[in-house]
UniProtKB/Swiss-Prot annotation:
Biological role: Involved in mRNA degradation. Catalyzes the phosphorolysis of single-stranded polyribonucleotides processively in the 3'- to 5'-direction.
Any single GO CC term annotated in Swiss-Prot or TrEMBL for this entry: cytosol
Similarity-based family: Belongs to the polyribonucleotide nucleotidyltransferase family.
Protein name per Swiss-Prot or TrEMBL: Polyribonucleotide nucleotidyltransferase
SMART domains hit by this protein: KH, S1
Record domain S1 motif: where: 624-692
Catalytic activity, EC: 2.7.7.8
Required cofactor(s): Mg(2+)
Length: 723
């Protein structure tokens, strides 16, 4: 009899066979599920503390998605040969798992919960993020931890008018859509997507299709729980302190209502601090002992009630706008004189300074992904220092939020970038958030597009982004355009839509409550389009098209092609030739395996010289052609003459003139410029030259050295050639 109480569930899910099992591996974890999708295998585990930490006022959920290199049959690089800090993909996938799980933990549950997902086997054609999300949901479901799941997830592609369920990597590469949707049986909770300018209807259809298809996985998790689940925790939220709620409400409600009539964020924030101080003083005067965390939660509920009530009753929003109005926009381009491209995009109290830098092929980011190494020619980095919100804080390496916001903005811009054969530059965008009051990632999209255009990148269209919110109470709802930070915090849905005049390029949706219908999402997407088109009109007015000239400080670039067999000649022994070329011409030279050479420099003269010299190095000597050569060395029986870079031939003593030559030094000297004809090239590459044949063909003459300078015309420097 086995020591394991193993439960296995298998099901067909689109083109993939899925296997979920629990009860064998990681039995001391609160919950552990192994998910196998066509040889992509993840181990998802969850552990929760039995009680919250004293004074805990938030839900401490941690999600760690970890890719093990052995999953792809690799040994890690570096000195220590161990997996190091999380890659960008690991960070983004951790966020992808976190976002749909977090809203499903019950209110008031403040115990530490840690979800850890290990990728232990990888089929390069099957991405691990969907199995990881399904596994994390299943591990929570079997653990008995308070959780209103399970959650299902699906990836949706779109090609030739058809939706694709969980497409392979090869299919994603040719798809017009890469969308991940997660949710419960009843509702969608999270959407993350990149699209090739698709309509709102197609995007909404993909969300609905993904939600329908994920039910297969949700049903399988239910079956797994029935057979292998642990008992549910005996947990209930702490009883509400009604007397405290009444006292805080009595003191705070009128003051909070006053605070939310202040339209400026700084004034409102100051007023809210005063309200908190007044409440604390009133409680102390009344002799009420209250936990600071508990009072803070009551205050938050009151703020939410005020803001949400005002909006649903048709009153102005926090800053005085109606539900559809976008904040005032100001745009300035070419902000930084030495940058290749820059733009300052300001929308209300949110501001992004976005800077574009152009580089060469050698500047591409080399990403050693689990599925295989690849190069990325477009980078977008998002930074939000603490001063952007008027606070102090840590400045340093990017946090998960910054990495996630940067990736969203990048997704929005990728569909409008020119192809590499149209614009060979490596592009880096950096978005510096200098002010923030909501929607900074969408400001990065707008500013990023303008910075690209300012740098002379021929983007296909303007791209704008807008952050939307939603307030839902029973059958009443209101969709908010261009939300503030407080509206994001107090609302039920945060979704960001970016795109062009022609369609959506990126969509990110996070829903905090269940009950948002297809019809509500339809209204929200239509209102988002209205806001996006308004922002696009402002951007088009500020900058109608990309600059036709690159910045004077940006590198110029030319591309040429040589035969792959000639690459080693250009590189030279130990890289000597190419190193000399780059140093002497002041250029950067990149050589691809197919023989494509990219020469970049801020000097057009340097590029032209480098190209000319490479053409000389790779040129083939042709029999019958006359070359301008240089005498390198004199021999008793002739001379060695260089006719092309790296191409030397023998000028035999009998091929100098038609008469008998007793001493070659009477006719030639080292360093002398002569015109010679290539008369023979054997299979070993040895060249035979003739001076007298060239003289006869061109009608020239040569005299002995002691009779004066050679009559042969001097060849131009660099070895030009003539038929």
């Amino acid at each position: 009899m086995s020591m394991f109480n193993k439960v296995v569930k298998e099901f067909q899910w689109g083109q993939h066979k899925v296997r979920m099992e629990t009860g064998e591996i990681a039995r001391q974890a609160g919950g552990a599920v192994l998910v196998d999708v066509e040889d992509t295998v993840v181990l998802a585990t969850v552990v929760a503390a039995k009680s919250p930490k004293p004074g805990q006022d938030f839900f401490p959920l941690t999600v760690d998605y970890i890719e093990k290199t052995y999953a792809a049959g690799k040994i890690p690089g570096g000195f220590f040969k161990r997996e190091g800090r999380p890659s960008e993909n690991e960070t983004l996938t951790s966020r992808l798992i976190d976002r749909p799980l977090r809203p499903l933990f019950p209110e008031g549950f403040y115990n530490d919960v840690q979800v850890v997902v290990h990728v232990v086997s990888l089929n390069p054609e099957v991405p691990a993020d969907i199995p990881a999300l399904i596994g994390a949901s299943a591990a929570l479901a079997v653990s008995g931890i308070p959780f209103n799941g399970p959650v299902g997830a699906a990836r949706v592609g779109y090609k030739d008018g058809q939706y694709l369920l969980n497409p392979t990597r090869s299919q994603i590469a040719t798809s017009d859509l890469d969308l991940v949707v997660a949710g419960t049986e009843r509702a969608v909770l999270m959407v993350e997507s990149e699209a090739n300018q698709l309509s709102e209807d197609v995007m909404l259809g993909a969300v609905v299709y993904g939600h329908e298809q994920m039910q297969t996985a949700i049903n399988a998790i239910h079956e797994l729980v029935r057979e292998g689940g642990k008992p549910e925790w005996d947990w209930a939220p702490a009883a509400k302190n009604e007397p405290l709620i009444a006292k805080v409400t009595e003191v705070a409600l009128p003051l909070l209502q006053e605070a939310y009539q202040l339209r400026q964020k700084s004034a409102r924030s100051q007023k809210l601090k005063e309200v908190s101080a007044n409440v604390a003083a009133a409680l102390a005067e009344a002799g009420v002992e209250a936990d600071k965390v508990e009072v803070g939660n009551i205050m938050f509920d009151l703020e939410a009630k005020i803001v949400r009530g005002q909006i649903l009753n048709g009153e102005p929003r926090i800053d005085g706008r109606d539900t559809r109005t976008v904040r005032p926009i100001e745009i300035r381009s070419s902000v930084l004189p030495r940058a290749h491209g820059s733009a300052l995009f300001t929308r209300g109290e949110t501001q992004a300074l976005v800077v574009a830098t152009l580089g060469t092929k050698s500047d591409e980011q080399i990403i050693d992904a689990l599925a295989g190494e690849y190069r990325d020619r477009f980078m977008l980095h998002y930074n939000m220092p603490p001063f952007a919100t008027g606070e102090t804080g840590r400045v340093g390496s990017p946090k998960r939020r910054e990495i996630g916001h940067g990736r969203l903005a990048k997704r929005a811009l990728i569909p409008v970038l020119p192809k590499e054969d149209e614009f060979a530059y490596t592009i880096r965008l950096v978005s510096e958030i200098t002010e923030s009051n909501g929607s900074s990632s969408m400001a990065s999209v707008c500013g990023g597009c303008l910075a690209l255009m300012d740098a002379g990148v021929p983007v296909k269209a303007h791209v704008a982004g807008v952050a939307m919110g939603l307030i839902l109470e029973g059958n009443k709802f209101a969709v908010l355009t261009d939300i503030l930070g407080d509206e994001d915090h107090l609302g039920d849905m945060d979704f960001k839509v970016a795109g062009t005049d022609n369609g959506i390029t990126a969509l990110q949706m996070d829903i905090k409550v269940q009950g948002i219908t297809k019809e509500i999402m339809q209204v929200a997407l239509a209102q988002a389009k209205e806001g996006r088109l308004h922002i696009l009109s402002n951007m088009q007015e500020a900058m109608g098209h990309a600059r036709t000239e690159l910045s004077a400080h940006a590198p110029r670039m030319i591309t040429m092609k040589i035969h792959p067999d000639k690459i080693r000649e250009v590189i030279g022994k130990g890289g000597s030739t190419i190193q000399a070329l780059t140093k002497e011409t002041g250029t950067t030279i990149d050589i691809q395996e197919d023989g494509t050479i990219t020469i970049a420099s801020t000097s057009t003269e340097g590029m032209a010289e480098a190209k000319r010299r490479i053409e000389g190095i790779t040129a083939e000597a042709e029999v019958g052609k006359i070359y301008a050569g240089t005498v390198l060395k004199l021999l008793d029986f002739g001379a060695i003459v260089n006719i092309l870079p790296g191409k030397d031939g023998l000028l035999h003593i009998s091929e100098i003139v038609n008469e008998r030559v007793k001493d070659i030094k009477d006719w030639l000297k080292e360093g002398q410029q002569v015109r010679v004809k290539l008369i023979q090239a054997d299979e070993k590459g040895r060249l035979r030259l003739s001076l007298k044949a060239a003289l006869a063909e061109e009608g020239g003459s040569i005299s002995p050295i002691n009779a004066g300078e050679s009559a042969a015309p001097a060849a131009p420097a660099g070895g030009s050639e003539q038929q």
